Structures are given as C-alpha cells and as structure tokens.
Amino acid sequence: MKHLLTLGLLGVMLANCQTKQSESVNETSENQVIETIMTRRSIRKYQPQAVARDTMDIILQCGINAPNGQNKQSWEVRVVDNPQLLDEMREAMAKGHPNMNPDMVKGCFRDAPTMVFIARDPAYDFSAYDCGLLAENMVLSAWSMGVGSICLGSPVRFLTDNDECKPLIDKLGFSEGYELSLCVGFGYPDETPAAKPRDWGKVKYVD
C-alpha cells in the first residue's frame, strides 16, 4: 500500500512538472515580443515598393521610445523613401570612391526602398549606444508588422569620407555637429533567410 502511495505521489509530481513545462513553452510561443526577436532576420532582398509612411511612423515612434542615457535623446533621424534621391546617393557614393567596384558601392543600401539615416551627438559619450538601441526598437517593431530591415555601416563611410557626397549629407539636414552613425534599410522582404547559429558559449553566469 505504501509503495502504491509513493508511486501515486510521483505520478502527480511528474504530471505537474510536465504541465508547468508545457505552460512555459506555450507562454514563450504566445509571447509576441519573444517570437519577434527570435524570428527576425536581416533582409538583403526587397520588393520594390517603399514602406507606407503610416507604417513607418509607427516604426519611428517605437524607435524614439527606446531607452537612452539620461533621456538626452542624443539622436536625429532622417527617412528617405524617394527613389530618385536614393539613386543620387548611390551615384555620388560611387563617384566618391573611384577605386572601388561601383556596383558594390551602389549596392550598399541592399536595394531597400526606404532608408533611415541615424546621426548622433558626439558631445555625449553614450550617444552611439543610444542610436543602437533606437535602431533595435525600429527593426523589431518593423518585423512584427511584416516589414524587413537591415542595419548598415558601409553607407556611413561611403557618404562621409569624400566631398562628392557632402551636398547629400547636407540635404539630410542634421543639426550642426551631429555625425551620421548608422543606416537602416526597410522594405517588404523578397526572401526568407534561415537563422544563423548563435554561440551560447559566449554567455556565462558568474556566481
């Protein structure tokens, strides 16, 4: 009898454990934030149409609501969805780098139809981190609405290290002293890239 009672208690404990594990899995799969983070991919092929501006407004609002040091909001954001202006930028970047493959330079936007240019205030030490947090909020909110994105560093260099592109940087109209820090392309995906492995070994608990 005692043996049967023990088995019964073990069965109840096991069932309870399995129920909790199942609930945990279900909670994770039903959590939109976690699902968005885990399914987001960098998109390098886009459909030609620009992201609707009302959708971009939501993405931008999510961006500027990112955490930032001392609430300095040490960023400025410019959005370009005019294909002619994006073409002007591509041409200027290629002309400004005559020793580089022009197709490679012109392709640095990855043909994203909507480009966001983020500048930082270098007078604040942590402004670069703030811009990164802003961009992360944007790409996650975009993905949750079916909009792909890609964070880009090469256009920053191509646009800022030569005189050919200066008129276009001036056209973006950043405040005096602000420096272009990051570019993010947005658009509707024309590919479904697989997830790339992440190295969990780089994460450790320290007791």
Question: Which stretches of residues belong to each language-model region?
Answer:
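Acidic, surface-exposed loops and disordered segments
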Residues: 14-207
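Sec-dependent signal peptide recognition
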Residues: 1-7
